[in-house]
Amino acid sequence: MARLVIVSNRVAIPEEGGKAVAAGGLAVAVKEAFTAYEGLWFGWSGTISEEPSEEPTLIDRGRVQYAVVDLSPQDHLEYYAGFANRALWPIMHYRLGLGAFSRSDYAGYSRVNRTFARALAKLVEPDDIIWVHDYHLLPLAAELRGLGLDNPIGYFHHIPWPAADVFNSLPASGELLRAIVDYDLIGLQTEADVQNLQRNLVDTQRAIPLGGGSLMVDGRRTRIRAFPIGIDVAGFKEAAEKANANKVVRETIAGLRTRKLLIGVDRLDYSKGVPER
């Protein structure tokens, strides 16, 4: 029976007894996917270790098995803090002036993706469907293909995909574009993001449009579509209804009178527009 194999930078492992995972967008999306499939969730443990092993630690929680690996201090510095968050994150959010490219950071980013691929390949079964998440892992499919895996591999990009002139300001842009077409299906948040990536592949990688979001690049076919992530409407509705029973909530609402109160919960990051709000 086919399993769903999720790969992300971090893994949200529920506590024994089924306590819910974190409420971030990626964690919620993955949790919903596992309601329909048995599967495996692979990624970084969140631990920095001086001598990390490539053999993942396996943790079983009902229908889902979690597989995590540690990162070395150098890997964390170059792959995560470096290329992913000092180069890709600002570029993807159109903040070129805040981006910083380092060859050593990019080497670390590539190295960790290669390490992840080697560790994951040992766990993947022939019928598994692999679904990779977010900008930390753009080259992962290419690394897996290089190890001989021909499983269906999809990718979902949780943040914006910028216009070609912005993305191509990154010195490694060509390598990343060539790597991303090793995914069979690429999911983005908006139609504008889809157009940005498709045009870039056509203009710089000689991709041939086939219709329906499909492209042929160097003999390989990939499909790019918009799949915007929503929220758990039923869950939010239930939480709001339960909140009315809370005395503090009732007093707050009464104190507002005719005014409206909007509450946002965000990291203190320039991409969140906190000062503007």
Predicted regions and their residues:
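Catalytic cores of carbohydrate-active enzymes across secretory and cytosolic contexts
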Residues: 1-276
